Amino acid sequence: MSSVTLVAKSKLPTPWGTFTLVGFQETGTGKDHAALVMGDITGDEPVLGRIHSECLTGDALFSLRCDCGFQLQAALENIAKAGRGVLLYVRQEGRGIGLLNKIRAYHLQDQGADTVEANVALGFAADMRDYTICADMLKQLEVKSLKLMTNNPRKMKAMESFGIPVAERVPLQEGRNPHNEFYLSTKANKLDHMFKK
């Protein structure tokens, strides 16, 4: 049984071209998630894709504390240039701890904690995201394999474990700045994210 149900589709014009916006609902929680699709993503050829976890602060409020908004824009640009691809927008804010806890974690980071220490101090694991829903979304979209835009090896392993082969990792290193340097270094050192030196 799938963890998500495809609920609705519409066109979504963006600065990079027109995507199909696909809405999904988690069967257990009712939480909604979205996919942006361009071109025909069915078939055997690997699809350029990104699994993007919701980041209100980076995606909508232009925060420089993270690289999320920069990665979101770059991923959509890359898909548009390719003419074919999918971006999953997964509602797992703050690596799964939610917006209010993310703000609490930011407060701890303001006092010197790194992103992992802040989550742990609040009683959470470093990363609480569940990638089962991502695999189920991709399967309902008939994606058979990915060229995954990510720096996170956990996303690649998760897709492989759920039967979505990752044919290629496409690095997505965007938006490094003085405000997120410590954050990105922590992701590399404690969460095994892959960044060029």
From Swiss-Prot:
Record-listed GTP binding positions: 50-54, 71, 93-95, 115, 150, 155
Any GO molecular function: GTP cyclohydrolase II activity
PANTHER family: 3,4-DIHYDROXY-2-BUTANONE 4-PHOSPHATE SYNTHASE (PTHR21327:SF18), GTP CYCLOHYDROLASE II-RELATED (PTHR21327)
Cofactor note: Binds 1 zinc ion per subunit.
Gene Ontology process terms (BP): riboflavin biosynthetic process
Cofactor: Zn(2+)
A Pfam family hit: GTP_cyclohydro2
Catalyzed reactions per annotation: GTP + 4 H2O = 2,5-diamino-6-hydroxy-4-(5-phosphoribosylamino)-pyrimidine + formate + 2 phosphate + 3 H(+)
Nucleotide-binding as UniProt keyword: yes
Name this polypeptide is given: GTP cyclohydrolase-2
EC number of this enzyme: 3.5.4.25
Any one cellular-component term (Gene Ontology): cytosol
Group of enzyme by EC: hydrolase
Family (UniProt): Belongs to the GTP cyclohydrolase II family.
Pathway entry: Cofactor biosynthesis; riboflavin biosynthesis; 5-amino-6-(D-ribitylamino)uracil from GTP: step 1/4
The entry's keywords: GTP-binding, Hydrolase, Metal-binding, Nucleotide-binding, Riboflavin biosynthesis, Zinc
Functional summary from the UniProt entry: Catalyzes the conversion of GTP to 2,5-diamino-6-ribosylamino-4(3H)-pyrimidinone 5'-phosphate (DARP), formate and pyrophosphate.
UniProt keyword Metal-binding present: yes
InterPro entries: GTP_cyclohydro_II, RibA, RibA-like_sf
Stored HAMAP family: RibA
Binding positions (Zn(2+)): 55, 66, 68
